[in-house]
Regions:
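Short, flexible loop/turn elements at secondary-structure junctions
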Residues: 4-5, 34-37, 91-94
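Active-site loop of short-chain dehydrogenase/reductase
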Residues: 19-43, 82-85
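NAD(P)H-dependent oxidoreductase Rossmann-fold/reductase module
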Residues: 45-209
Length: 209
């Protein structure tokens, strides 16, 4: 989880002074590739703020916690840096690449993948399309919050504000049709995510000097 969330937030915060120097009319663009728009079922009484408990730690639980916190933290950053920086969390989908055929994978997997690929081709994203989407994310379709925008091609943010500065998008660069985590949002959710994240990062910095 440290590589999927905490270290990425740390990079963003440390690079912010350079990002603020951007002359891009739509602002600088920060793109985090993981699970944008993937919203797992969540207990409203137990919001996934912080890492999952050890007994529940796994691929799905980590995704749940990372996606939830990243959405709210990006919204906070978009507010702080309105007019200057855009924050995008993208789900790239299943991208057909050389990793699946790497000799480091077991032979059975490489054989099985060649069969599975045929059945999953309708769902997969080609490397070319994936690359085109990543380039698109750096354009004015996803501007910093408050940047003067016009036209229906400007994306809606995770709060369903057109050009809102914090975006959760899928493998085609499309946003959700409703507010992210709409039924789970509380008045202090964003603040709780912020305090937790900064507490962890400040604690680590204190340990390392």
């Amino acid at each position: 989880m440290s590589l999927l969330y905490y270290s990425r937030i740390r990079f963003i915060l440390k690079l912010t002074p350079l990002l603020l120097c951007s002359q891009n009319p739509s602002g600088a663009h920060v793109t985090s590739i993981f699970a944008g728009t993937v919203e797992d079922a969540i207990d409203a009484k137990n919001l996934p703020i912080g890492p999952p408990p050890p007994e529940k730690y796994g691929v799905t639980s980590v995704r749940t916690h990372v996606s939830f916190m990243k959405t709210h933290f990006f919204e906070a950053l978009a507010e702080q840096h309105a007019g200057n920086i855009s924050f995008i969390h993208v789900f790239p989908g299943l991208v057909d690449g050389p990793t699946f055929y790497n000799d480091a994978n077991p032979l059975w997997f490489r054989v099985l993948w060649r069969v599975a690929k045929v059945m999953m081709s309708w769902y997969m994203t080609s490397p070319q399309v994936c690359g085109e989407v990543m380039v698109l994310l750096g354009t004015g379709r996803y501007p910093a919050k408050g940047v003067a925008v016009g036209g229906d091609d400007v994306a809606f943010s995770s709060t369903r504000e057109r050009g809102g500065g914090a975006y959760a998008v899928d493998q085609r660069g499309d946003e959700k049709k409703q507010v992210s985590y709409e039924k789970l949002r509380q008045s202090d959710t964003r603040d709780r995510v912020w305090k937790h994240t900064m507490g962890v990062l400040n604690g680590i910095q204190g340990m390392t000097g």
